[in-house]
């Protein structure tokens, strides 16, 4: 191999690295700007995140109050909101920079096949996060608050022997509440990526609807394991997570089956489809 040939092959690599550097800088710049913006408005963001717990407490006639257990807790809550919120805010820009880096190396038909999944991924994440925030969190918090005891509960009769016991009431920590809420929201957002990921694999021919259906029982075990890992360590949270993930898995099978039928119809029209029976005879 001559020196000239080495130089010719090295040039495209250097160009790719330069392009990668440019895209990373754009993505990081967008993230930094988003982090600064979210830090400035961290208090309204945190107030928005407390709506589910405040509504659950209000339904029980209790005041909504979260405490600073540690002196530095408020600062770290603001930092966490800035970092997580900044990533969520900058995610479309990060995805766009990823696409700008990958797209030049794809054929036109590959771009048409891949672009819908690139758009669907953040959309499904935000759908999962919204589903968690507006539906799952109110249900979960109402369930958890049901374990309060004593006259802290609105309408409880203090003269009732059943209420003459140690008062067990909710005294929330800002940091712990943020951790719990973001863990729920992120978990549901990530789990809502399942149809996107499996459909993309089906589009690429790496998985089939029949294969996904045949490993359903193993998938159930995997879903239960994931539910136990990504949710708080209580049965109710894990059951809620599994009840959402499983329909997504079945929906993924349906989408992959539709892709397979569309591919088969196209190949039959082109005369390139080979039936299994014909393949066996050959």
Swiss-Prot record:
* NCBIfam families per UniProt: tatC
- Annotated membrane-spanning segments are 30-50, 74-94, 117-137, 184-204, 235-255
A GO BP entry: intracellular protein transmembrane transport
Name the gene behind this protein.
tatC
Provide the membrane topology annotation. Multi-pass membrane protein
The task this protein performs is described as: Part of the twin-arginine translocation (Tat) system that transports large folded proteins containing a characteristic twin-arginine motif in their signal peptide across membranes. Together with TatB, TatC is part of a receptor directly interacting with Tat signal peptides.
Its lineage opens with: Bacteria, Pseudomonadati, Pseudomonadota, Alphaproteobacteria, Rhodobacterales
Q: Name one GO molecular function term.
A: proton motive force dependent protein transmembrane transporter activity
The name this protein carries in UniProt is Sec-independent protein translocase protein TatC
